[in-house]
Amino acid sequence: MFGKSIEAYTKACEVIPGGVDSPVRAFKSVGGTPPFIKKGKGAYLYDVDGNKYVDFVQSWGPLIFGHCDKDIEKVVIKTAKKGLSFGAPTKLETKLASEIVEMYDNIDKVRFVSSGTEATMSAIRLARGVTGKNDIVKFEGCYHGHSDSLLVQAGSGLATFGSPSSPGVPSDLTKHTLLCEYNNIKNLEKCFADSSDIACIIIEPIAGNMGLVPASEEFLKACRELCDKHGALLIFDEVMSGFRASLTGASGIVKTKADIITFGKVIGAGMPVGAFAASKEIMSNLSPEGKIYQAGTLSGNPVAMAAGLKSLRKLKANPDIYDELNKKALRLVNGLKKIANKYEIPFQVDTRGSMFGFFFCEKEPKNFKDVGLCDFKRFATFHHEMLKKGFYFACSQYETGFICTKITNKDIDACLKAANEVMKNL
């Protein structure tokens, strides 16, 4: 069933570290060999062995309209024919930035970059420059990209490999990263009591790299109040949740407002792009207006801007999309929960918009430590058995799943039928 993928992976390992260009893809969390994908269309992936899968990963979130959406595909081809990159300003950047600014009451200006990592890295530099302080607060299990100062208990791939941080990261950098427990207000208060040099808190308001674990309203309120009290800035990392959890991401669901928001994934519709945004008072500190430097050769490249612009305009023109996506996500996870209960399997589920998560555990996880208590062996078995039946879930208990518009109720019901067969023997 996977012979050609195994062959492809073996060859890849000879010239690419671990055979992949992002660690989680190597299936280390669940074991085995990853399928090598040949193409995607709509809700489906097709691998080199000819296997077809309903895709509940959607490239880890960007493809809210599924693979090869005709509207996005059309503008990408049209734009690419005019040039892939100019290293000069284009109107497309202004149009996409304007679309984003119009949607948020706490954003005046946007700066585009080429990845989510660049977005969070730049947002932290901006916060440090604006406040004149050095320390940053992050939370166990929240992943903010692979820049040096953020690779501390980062969840996702690092969690899979059991690394609290990565070799190659100088202690001189991580000493300014203060680690707190997610959803633990007392722990956060102590952090601020211990340091008078905190520039910012960076948080995933809906954590997606320890499975799906939302921050409580009380916790986000505490983040806001502590930042205001101590002259720090609050950064929402919405690289994953932006335009996914709702039209305005997690920011549109929670009551707390951030000073800086980072974006990625959906705003590129599958193209490499990231962004960070804030008020004009904060953003005016960026070069060339201000003294805080940030740059990128491919930042704001026209193809990514065109794809993102079409994606956002489609979302804004169809406000019912999020309700429909959430209903599908609930149909899936509630169905899985019902099956798990039938077979007396400890199982927890949650959704936010088109994002979903499930855990093989007794109680609903509230933080990284809770997720670590889940049954990872059972998850791995479930993952592989569902893969054999044609359903492609995230290959780690620490990852979030995604619904796209092309996934149908028929696809979900077929998935639940397969899950019933798997869980009765799990």
Swiss-Prot record:
Its EC number is 5.4.3.8. It catalyses: (S)-4-amino-5-oxopentanoate = 5-aminolevulinate. This is Glutamate-1-semialdehyde 2,1-aminomutase. The modification N6-(pyridoxal phosphate)lysine is found at residue 265. GO terms for biological process: protoporphyrinogen IX biosynthetic process. Gene3D superfamilies: Aspartate Aminotransferase, domain 1 (3.90.1150.10), Type I PLP-dependent aspartate aminotransferase-like (Major domain) (3.40.640.10). It holds the Pfam family Aminotran_3. Pathway: Porphyrin-containing compound metabolism; protoporphyrin-IX biosynthesis; 5-aminolevulinate from L-glutamyl-tRNA(Glu): step 2/2. GO terms for cellular component: cytoplasm. Belongs to the class-III pyridoxal-phosphate-dependent aminotransferase family. HemL subfamily. It is found in: Cytoplasm. PANTHER family: GLUTAMATE-1-SEMIALDEHYDE 2,1-AMINOMUTASE (PTHR43713), GLUTAMATE-1-SEMIALDEHYDE 2,1-AMINOMUTASE 1, CHLOROPLASTIC-RELATED (PTHR43713:SF3). It comes from Aliarcobacter butzleri (strain RM4018) (Arcobacter butzleri). Homodimer. Its cofactor is pyridoxal 5'-phosphate. Keywords: Cytoplasm, Isomerase, Porphyrin biosynthesis, Pyridoxal phosphate. The keyword tRNA processing does not apply. Coiled coil: none annotated. It is an enzyme of class 5 (isomerase). One of its GO terms (molecular function) is pyridoxal phosphate binding.
